């Protein structure tokens, strides 16, 4: 058991609360210690405290909880000297809140300098992950398991353990012949049908959705943005230009270039609008939409590049360093105006379907401010439209720690007055893949002597990262999405330690290449959840003990009922129909008993015409 010394030196809130005392929580404790704060105004609060936690065993967490709601909490980073811990999103009713520390390990925790601050809104925190590969992994026979080795649905399991946002990446037409000439993405996955299905799984599990348009048939990043094959065909059919022909690209006139850019912008709008409309029709409107993936180099090369570059004619990838084939390469002139055309077309399409969806522009190399200021200064100068700045942050590639990432978020959010989301992060829990070879993330020098590539090292890195991002000034960091939590090793029974899952398929022999992230996922080589899942579980925002989420399409309303209590709850979904004169013409009442700490989905058919949906959650009636 952990020994907890909790010194409540002062509890300061924006309203004046007469509360200041020192409490010595010493001796063995079971499950932690807490204190109740009273005489509070109802509303939302953030909690901070300085915490010393020298033990790496298990997880310990600072929390705040009020009657009728689950706890908001943050896992304590390992720190012998003390670190400021931030808990966001505590919801208070009945004028009181219990604050405390929970633990499942051994050691000593000291807590001091506690502040409970009233806020004007619930400052929640997104702690999500990329779920795009789940259907692909399951098709290969991969299984996801809980901590005890029981098979689970990864969406439901991760949602129940604190993951609240699913990233889903859409590639246009994956399959043989649509990659870079050497590799391709497997057909039938990451395409429209698959991503719509993944979105439904995410919503049914109670997750929000961050939807990424790759605008490519293949992996896209800062050096590779290949125009989708169907768009290439459309441009050739409608304009007569072959935008995959290197000789044409190197000889086209400025008028031809502008004509193609305008057509691409039109295609971007129509494609984005169509996919967004299909998401809306099935009740899975994304909360956040990313236009492209890591587009620091631009989009739809060579028509939207951010700097002068060359692209090889075989793989359509930017060339860096000693270019031995410079005379044959495709020239990619800097063209910010073209990029902004594409961004604004995508933005307008998203907003035409869902005004509430926030549009993200996502770059790599998060924590390196100069790369972002160069990019967003140009976007703003040219009138690009976006709502949120997205950044990938990998310690192995940026060689910056989580504190530096926090300071980067502070600087960039203040300069551009935009919220920030960390779109990707990852860390090794094993030095190599299962076959003994290195994965794509090499251990970062910045954490070399702090967090080794072990399960414990991974857990401690995640705890530090979550806490640092929660402490970004004015809560302007929305949260963080992990890449990739679910692209797990799937054992090849004919080739020991090799994986059936891989990052891409070879054009030459149609064999899957290696899985470069299998030693960074949130499940181990056998598919079993790793300890870092507990960091998600104990780093959450408050929600109602019986939490209700509804989605609807044209024919029915689907209600997800999440019972976060230790007893069975009876919940009723009531649908009232109205005629054209607003007179009630029908009532449906569907009740469901939901067992303790589980979730159920209730589906009710919608009547023709107007309707209203109400939910009785066991204690109050809620209009949805």
Question: Where in the sequence are the language-model features?
Answer:
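Aromatic-rich peripheral "rim/lid" segments of glycoside hydrolase catalytic domains that contact
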Residues: 308-309, 318-319, 407, 411, ...
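Extracellular ligand-binding interfaces
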Residues: 52-80, 575
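Boundary/entry segment of secreted carbohydrate-active catalytic domains
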Residues: 121-157
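Short beta-strand-plus-loop segments that form exposed binding edges in beta-rich domains
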Residues: 100-107
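Substrate-binding cleft and catalytic face of glycoside hydrolase catalytic domains
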Residues: 157-321, 328-335, 339-358, 364
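Extra-cytoplasmic beta-strand recognition segments
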Residues: 25-27, 33-56, 83-90, 113-115, ...
């Amino acid at each position: 058991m952990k020994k907890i010394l909790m010194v409540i030196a002062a509890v300061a809130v924006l309203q004046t609360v007469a509360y200041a005392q020192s409490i010595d929580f010493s001796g063995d404790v079971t499950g932690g210690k807490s204190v109740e704060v009273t005489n509070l105004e109802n509303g939302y609060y953030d909690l901070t405290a300085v915490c010393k936690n020298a033990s790496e065993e298990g997880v310990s967490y600072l929390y705040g909880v009020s009657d009728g709601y689950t706890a908001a909490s943050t896992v304590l980073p390992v720190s012998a000297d003390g670190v400021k811990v931030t808990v966001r999103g505590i919801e208070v009713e009945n004028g009181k809140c219990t604050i405390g520390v929970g633990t499942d390990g051994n050691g000593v925790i000291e807590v001091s300098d506690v502040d409970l601050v009233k806020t004007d809104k619930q400052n929640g925190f997104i702690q999500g992950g990329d779920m795009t590969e789940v259907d692909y992994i399951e098709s290969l026979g991969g299984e996801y398991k809980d901590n005890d080795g029981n098979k689970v649905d990864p969406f439901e399991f991760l949602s129940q353990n604190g993951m609240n946002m699913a990233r889903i990446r859409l590639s246009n037409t994956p399959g043989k012949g649509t990659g870079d000439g050497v590799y391709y993405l497997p057909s039938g996955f990451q395409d429209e049908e698959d991503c719509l299905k993944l979105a439904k799984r995410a919503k049914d599990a109670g997750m929000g959705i961050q939807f990424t348009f790759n605008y490519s048939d293949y992996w896209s990043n800062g050096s590779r943005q290949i125009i989708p094959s169907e768009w290439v065909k459309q441009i050739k059919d409608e304009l007569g230009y072959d935008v995959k022909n290197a000789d044409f690209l190197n000889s086209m006139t400025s008028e031809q270039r502008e004509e193609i850019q305008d057509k691409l912008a039109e295609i971007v709008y129509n494609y984005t609008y169509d996919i967004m409309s299909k998401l809306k029709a099935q009740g899975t409107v994304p909360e956040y939409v990313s236009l492209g993936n890591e587009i620091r180099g631009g989009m739809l090369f060579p028509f939207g590049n951010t700097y002068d570059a060359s692209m090889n004619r075989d793989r359509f990838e930017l060339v860096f360093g000693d270019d031995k084939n410079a005379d044959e390469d495709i020239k990619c002139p800097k063209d910010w105006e073209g990029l902004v055309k594409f961004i604004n077309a995508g933005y307008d399409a998203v907003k035409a379907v869902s005004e509430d969806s926030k549009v993200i522009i996502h770059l790599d190399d998060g924590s390196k401010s100069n790369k972002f200021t160069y990019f967003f200064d140009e976007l703003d100068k040219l009138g690009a439209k976006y709502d949120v700045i997205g950044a990938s942050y990998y310690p192995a590639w940026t060689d910056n720690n989580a504190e530096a990432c926090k300071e980067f978020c502070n600087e960039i959010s203040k300069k551009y007055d935009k919220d920030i989301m960390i779109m990707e992060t990852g860390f090794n829990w094993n030095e190599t893949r299962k076959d003994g070879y290195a994965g794509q993330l090499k251990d970062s020098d910045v954490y070399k002597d702090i967090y080794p590539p072990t399960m414990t090292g991974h857990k401690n890195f995640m705890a530090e990262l979550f806490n640092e991002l929660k402490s970004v000034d004015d809560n302007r960091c929305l949260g963080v999405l992990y890449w990739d939590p679910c692209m797990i090793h799937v054992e090849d029974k004919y080739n020991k330690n090799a994986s059936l899952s891989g990052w891409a398929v070879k054009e030459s022999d149609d064999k899957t290449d290696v899985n470069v992230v299998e030693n960074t996922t949130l499940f181990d080589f056998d598919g079993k959840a790793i300890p870092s899942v507990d960091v998600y579980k104990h780093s959450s925002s408050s929600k109602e003990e019986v939490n209700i989420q509804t989605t609807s399409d044209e024919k029915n309303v689907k209600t997800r009922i999440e019972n976060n209590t230790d007893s069975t709850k009876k919940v009723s979904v009531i649908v009232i129909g109205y005629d054209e004169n607003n007179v009630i013409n029908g009532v449906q009442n569907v009740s469901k008993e939901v067992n303790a700490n589980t979730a159920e989905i209730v589906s009710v058919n919608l009547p023709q015409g107007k309707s209203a949906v109400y939910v009785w959650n066991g204690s109050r009636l809620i209009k949805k």
